[in-house]
Amino acid sequence: MADKQTVVVDNGSGVVKAGFSGEDAPRAVFPSIIGRPKNVSALIGVDSASEYIGDEAQQKRGVLKIFYPIEHGIIKDWEDMEKIWNHTFYVELRVQPDEHPVLLTEAPLNPKTNREKMTQIMFETFNVPALYVAIQAVLSLYSAGRTTGIVCDAGDGVTHTVPIYEGFSIPHAVSRIQLAGRDLTTFMAKLLTEKGYVFTSSAEMEIVRDIKEKLCFVALDYEAAMKQSYESTTFEKNYELPDGRVITIGNARFRCPEYLFKPLEMNGKELDSIQSLTYNSIQECDVDVRRDLYQNITLSGGTTMYEGIGERLLKEIEARAPKSINVKVIASPDRRFAVWRGGSTLTSLSTFASMWITKEDYDENGASIVHRKCL
């Protein structure tokens, strides 16, 4: 087994990142989606598939209904998820899963059944020789080259904060909110509706996601930015739709990600903001470790890619933290792949060899072994 390269798969709610242990970046990055035709094929004799996965579904989205098997970090549709894993191994990476140990990732505080079922499918459907399921945020810290810090990981389905001290996560202080990229996309669609631009179908929501990813940023001072947006056209940017129409996006560019910082005011959701989530997680930890955590706030995940988010989080945390503490927010440029890179690093360590759940472990103990071996 040692001579076979480990396959590292970061199953995001929105994007799958997959590749080989020891490499710097994932070889395959594709949307975690399955597209099924809305209508029966009008092209007689043309061989049209009944479903498309990943990039192909994205390209043909105009005639498809788009399904996401993972919602808020939890796998909701196991049949579709199996298809995505199948696509990952055989099409994207071109490997036989029964020849490679596999590392999968998941969000903290997921239902136990989620990781048990993942384990069962990997051993029984894909016959992997060995498996490990790692918590996403812990891997992000590895990729930042640290063993102590608090990770704020915001992806497409879930945002979570995980304090880690000397390599151990502090479970009682871990927190998560169901507010992440996909919710921002829905909110962006709502803001665009105010302007008279209506996006409703699953394919149109993909356009909204693209607008959000390309044009949004986080304002350091939201009120000042709003005032400025009423007085001038500084923030206006054009976006060309697939049909050639051009729409103008103004203050929605920063109103959308503001949802992360003010869920209640922006969209009536009684959820913790990302600054409260981070601050409360730190406060839940022992008083002796808090300073180290404040000095190592690490951002990870695609929803932390907005310009200005690091500076804004720093400002919000500084307002809450004791004055004597020098708060530091670390935002590496390729943090959307931080989880994957951490998995690649972790599995290349010689000390990791004893961590795997082997096929024998699984046959002997069943899927519940995952709770004992993967902490």
Swiss-Prot record:
GO terms for MF: ATP binding; hydrolase activity
One Pfam family hit: Actin
Keyword Mitochondrion included in the entry's annotation: no
Annotated localization: Cytoplasm, Cytoskeleton
SMART domains: ACTIN
Enzyme class (EC, first level): hydrolase
Catalytic activity, as annotated: ATP + H2O = ADP + phosphate + H(+)
Primary location: cytoplasm
Free-text function comment from the UniProt entry: Actins are highly conserved proteins that are involved in various types of cell motility and are ubiquitously expressed in all eukaryotic cells.
Record-given protein name: Actin, cytoplasmic
